[in-house]
């Protein structure tokens, strides 16, 4: 047997041993230990080839090259005559990766981090990388206050040089802040300063923002808040000298000490602006005006810089630089602010592009643009385009990106990146109440028909008391100037008695056409004509109905028909930040109609809806919503408004917790009426001379509804779905009344239905979800102020309608 000479041993387990420094010519190369790695691949990674003359340095380079491939745990190179014998031990292949005990970090996030480090199924296992991963994960837990956390990588060998990799987590508990001390504060108390922190050593039950669990990132944010607090009050020399975070021996408690130097208060002595102002010095000077003796304020300085950038952005200077340098005079405690402005190049827009609009046509988005291609860039015009796209309601998110054109010093492309949502909805509603039982409704609505922007709806209701169908179409851009054209046709067969309303049947059909005229960015006027035919039958006489029939000259009619032509009008002010689930802004909608000559009836009717969203945090996750709805109508020329045109309240869109349309005046049937006027739902004759009181709603010619809603982040919902789900707590109130009601015409036990003070109230919780079927709305409300005859419906569920 030929004697083998050891040239260099493993870099991991023994030192390099050199024999034959003179070198030799390699006639052959053999490998031992290769399993997964092919011989050819191993040879290609080596700097030595057959026929080369090699020495100790070449052998060292060979070993390093083989280790560098990441495929081997051990490499030895031996000489057998003129043959190189390469002995290797391959790293095992990862067959599977699992996790155990991780609650704070999701599996998907862990897999992404492992893949970024080269640890994935099918790859070789590098044990040194595992150590780094263990340490990195433990450091993450330490940063969020879990100092007792540990992460261990468990490697289980499998046949054919494979392993199972399992990361075992012991997260422990978050260390809670025992005390926060601020040392060096004299102008403000420690309690006052800490009240602005997210981290707290004491958190009252009502504080949903404060947190006793220590997090390094939150502490950094709180320190910045502390700095801003002082700088905004004139303390220009304020400094955070040091911060100590101490851990209790059991690693469950944290003590934080912040050492500060307040310094003195300084006043602004003036602002000096210099640099390239691009000819807008007068406008910039207005933005930098200060009141004499005003305290230095860091936030105002930052806002001033942003305002200057926005001003220049409106004129096409897309990338201006604005830097403020305070010159502090310690002698007289003043600060002179020197503002250097560099407007940079002026840009014009080469192209406007859209990304993410797989359904919506480019033309639908482009017509909402206020920034034009080939024109100077205007940041305000770009933002207006974003607002208008958001208000369409077609998209979950809209983002803008201004991109430089390569090779051009004065051109940019504006890119609108949208994420489309499902604009079609299958409208299905179900409600359940202690008295009402189960009720249903259905319909289909598509607000972006085939991506054209057309709104098309087919709605229908079929139940025990109603057969209703409607087809509606709206073209929002009937003309290139944005004049809209909408129309609808409908048919309705309504058995009011079965709906717990006053006893009559109405078969109606009609149509209307409406034009919308945009006045400016936020205001639209509407005008149109309508026709409706109403055929009433089976009318059991009740006081409100009799008043109407008497005004029409047919007081004893049990059947009645009317054909009416109406002039329809409206006005909409819309400054909401987006079309669905708004978080900021207001919307006002006024609608009305009045009969025109040729109509059997003579009346007018008007309603006003308002909604205002006020965010109370910068991220718009906590929002206060106020809604109102007002309605009023009356007859003209001595006639009354038809009773079937009355306003109603109650239900998911007005006062939740009450059955739909049941709030307000109830029918008082006249002597001889044959109806189910009592609570037993048994038909019988009314025999009381003064009339019979009932629980059948008749509505009124006046209505007022208001709602106060507090929108909160939805618990247990990931950030991915945060824009699709909304949770809120609400307080609803509303009333319906009849301004023409005469209390003397009814029995003494009947309430005064002309009194608007009979307000109903409820409170509850609502959940809205933009599901694949369309908007899903769940609400549970408890009426806490109601009157005799009101019908509760605590749980309500609806698909296809949000507010």
From Swiss-Prot:
PROSITE patterns: POTRA (PS51779)
Domain of life: Bacteria
Residue intervals of the POTRA domain: 24-91, 92-172, 175-263, 266-344, 347-421
GO cellular component, one term: Bam protein complex
Chief site of localization: membrane
One GO biological process term: protein insertion into membrane
Location(s) in or outside the cell: Cell outer membrane
Keyword annotations of the record: Cell outer membrane, Membrane, Repeat, Signal, Transmembrane, Transmembrane beta strand
Function description: Part of the outer membrane protein assembly complex, which is involved in assembly and insertion of beta-barrel proteins into the outer membrane. Constitutes, with BamD, the core component of the assembly machinery.
Complex and partners: Part of the Bam complex, which is composed of the outer membrane protein BamA, and four lipoproteins BamB, BamC, BamD and BamE.
Family stated for the protein in its record: Belongs to the BamA family.
Protein name as catalogued: Outer membrane protein assembly factor BamA
Lineage, highest ranks first: Bacteria, Pseudomonadati, Pseudomonadota, Gammaproteobacteria, Enterobacterales
Gene responsible for this protein: bamA
């Amino acid at each position: 047997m030929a004697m083998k000479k050891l040239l260099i041993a493993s870099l991991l387990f023994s030192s390099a041993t050199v024999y034959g420094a003179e070198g030799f010519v390699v006639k052959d190369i053999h490998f031992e230990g290769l399993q997964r790695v092919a011989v050819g691949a191993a040879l290609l990674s080596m700097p030595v080839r057959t026929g080369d003359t090699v020495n100790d340095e070449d052998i060292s380079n060979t070993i390093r090259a083989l280790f560098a491939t990441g495929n081997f745990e051990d490499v030895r190179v031996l000489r057998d005559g003129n043959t190189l014998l390469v002995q290797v031990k391959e790293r095992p292949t990862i067959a599977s990766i699992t996790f155990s005990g991780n609650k704070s970090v999701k599996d998907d996030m862990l897999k992404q981090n492992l893949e970024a480090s080269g640890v994935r199924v099918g790859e070789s296992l590098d044990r040194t990388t595992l150590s780094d991963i263990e340490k990195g994960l433990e450091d993450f837990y330490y940063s969020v206050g879990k100092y007792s956390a540990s992460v261990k990588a468990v490697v289980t060998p499998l046949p054919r040089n494979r392993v199972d990799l399992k990361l075992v987590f012991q997260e422990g508990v978050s260390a809670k802040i025992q005390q926060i001390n601020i040392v060096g504060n004299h102008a403000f108390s420690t309690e006052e300063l800490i009240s602005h922190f997210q981290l707290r050593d004491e958190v009252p039950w009502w504080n949903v923002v404060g947190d006793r669990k220590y997090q390094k990132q939150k502490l950094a944010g709180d320190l910045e808040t502390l700095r801003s607090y002082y700088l905004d009050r004139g303390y220009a020399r304020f400094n955070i000298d040091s911060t100590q975070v101490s851990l209790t021996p059991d690693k469950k408690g944290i003590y934080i000490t912040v050492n500060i130097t307040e310094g003195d208060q300084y006043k602004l002595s003036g602002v000096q602006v210099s640099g390239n102002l691009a000819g807008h010095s007068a406008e910039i000077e207005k933005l930098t005006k200060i009141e004499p003796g005003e305290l230095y304020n860091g936030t105002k300085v930052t806002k001033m810089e942003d305002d200057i950038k926005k001003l220049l952005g409106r004129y096409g200077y897309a990338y201006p630089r604005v830097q403020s340098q305070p010159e502090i005079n310690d002698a007289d405690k003043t600060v002179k602010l020197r503002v250097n402005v560099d407007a940079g190049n002026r840009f014009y827009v080469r192209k406007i592009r859209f990304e993410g609009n797989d359904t919506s046509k480019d033309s639908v988005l482009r017509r909402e643009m206020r920034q034009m291609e080939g024109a100077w860039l205007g940041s305000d015009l770009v933002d207006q385009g974003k607002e208008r796209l958001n208000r369409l309601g077609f998209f979950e998110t809209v983002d803008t990106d201004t991109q430089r054109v390569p090779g051009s010093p004065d051109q940019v492309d504006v890119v609108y990146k949208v994420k489309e949502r499902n604009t079609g909805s299958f409208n299905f509603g179900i409600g359940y109440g202690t008295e009402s039982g189960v009720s249903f409704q259905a319909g289909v609505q598509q607000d972006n028909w085939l991506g054209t922007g057309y709104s098309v709806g087919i709605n229908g209701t079929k139940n025990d008391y109603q057969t209703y169908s409607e087809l509606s179409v709206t073209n929002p851009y009937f003309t290139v100037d944005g004049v809209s054209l909408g129309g609808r046709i409908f048919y309705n067969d309504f058995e009011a008695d079965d709906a717990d309303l006053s006893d009559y049947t109405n078969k109606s059909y009609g149509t209307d056409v409406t034009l919308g005229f945009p006045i400016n960015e936020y205001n639209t006027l509407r005008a149109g004509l309508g026709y409706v035919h109403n055929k009433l039958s089976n009318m059991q006489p009740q006081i409100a109905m009799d008043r109407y029939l008497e005004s029409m000259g047919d007081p004893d009619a049990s059947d009645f028909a009317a054909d009416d032509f109406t002039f329809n009008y409206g006005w909409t002010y819309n400054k909401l930040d987006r079309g669905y689930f708004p978080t900021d802004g207001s919307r006002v909608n006024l609608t009305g109609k009045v009969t025109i000559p040729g109509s059997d009836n003579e009346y007018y009717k008007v309603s006003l809806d308002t909604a205002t969203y006020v965010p109370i945090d910068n991220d718009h996750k906590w929002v206060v919503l106020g809604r109102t709805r007002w309605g009023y109508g009356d007859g003209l020329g001595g006639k009354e408004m038809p009773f079937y045109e009355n306003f109603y309240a109650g239900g998911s869109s007005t006062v939740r917790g009450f059955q739909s349309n049941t709030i307000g005046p109830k029918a008082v049937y006249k002597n001889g009426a044959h109806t189910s006027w009592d609570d037993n739902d048994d038909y019988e004759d009314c025999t009381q001379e003064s009339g019979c009181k009932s629980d059948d709603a008749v509505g009124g010619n006046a209505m007022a509804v208001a709602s106060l809603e507090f929108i909160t982040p939805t618990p247990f919902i990931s950030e991915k779905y945060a824009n699709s789900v909304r949770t809120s707590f609400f307080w609803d109130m509303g009333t319906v009344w009849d301004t023409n009601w005469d209390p003397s015409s009814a029995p003494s036990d009947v309430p005064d239905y002309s009194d608007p003070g009979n307000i109903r109230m409820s409170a509850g919780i609502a959940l809205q979800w933009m599901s694949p079927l369309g908007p899903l709305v769940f609400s549970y409300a408890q009426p806490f102020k109601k009157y005799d005859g009101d019908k509760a419906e605590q749980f309500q569920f609806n698909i296809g309608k949000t507010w």
